[in-house]
């Protein structure tokens, strides 16, 4: 990013970033200011699985942004209820939990499992299995679950 190397980034160095940046994306391609195209194998670590600049998604986001940008979970959100109902129907579940990231999902899974067994007086059910060579998030609990010292 800084060609003269005299400047330093103001970002904490928690990523080993490649010395390249992109101006835009189309589908599965990332494009530099010079017009060089790179196939996006990382897809934003799975957050861009539908590709970049998808017309259907862009139109839906613009339409929603003209109505409401964000509503706190302190209020009822009819669309959220509808999606929850659909997910429960597809997965044969009673409830779902929406969150913003894998970290929040992992933290919630641990808390929900602990609460469930605590409520059943199964205090011996306190072992949490973790996947080797996986990244679970940067909270203290999830870092403890990660076997990679790099994190």
Please place each PLM-identified region on the residue numbering.
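Glycine-rich phosphate-binding segment of PLP-dependent enzymes
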Residues: 38, 44-74, 78, 84-100
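Hydrophobic alpha-helical segments, especially N-terminal targeting/anchoring helices
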Residues: 31-32
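Short clusters of small/polar residues that mark proteolytic maturation junctions
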Residues: 42-43, 144
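Active-site-adjacent loop/helix segments that line or gate small-molecule/cofactor pockets in enzymes
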Residues: 1-26, 43, 74
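PLP-dependent aspartate aminotransferase-fold enzymes
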Residues: 86-151
């Amino acid at each position: 990013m800084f060609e003269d190397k005299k400047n330093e980034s103001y970002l904490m160095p928690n990523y080993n970033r490649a010395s390249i940046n992109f101006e835009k994306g189309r589908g599965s391609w990332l494009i530099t200011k010079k017009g060089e195209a790179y196939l996006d194998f990382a897809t934003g670590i799975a957050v861009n699985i539908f590709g970049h600049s998808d017309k259907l998604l862009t139109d839906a986001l613009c339409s929603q942004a003209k109505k409401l940008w964000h509503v706190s979970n302190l209020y009822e959100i009819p669309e959220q209820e509808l999606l929850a109902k659909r997910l429960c129907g597809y997965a044969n579940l009673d409830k779902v939990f929406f969150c913003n990231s894998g970290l929040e999902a992992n933290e919630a899974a641990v808390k929900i499992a602990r609460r469930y067994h605590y409520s059943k007086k199964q205090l011996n059910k306190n072992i949490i299995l973790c996947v080797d060579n996986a990244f679970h998030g940067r909270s203290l609990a999830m870092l403890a679950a990660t076997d990679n010292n790099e994190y």
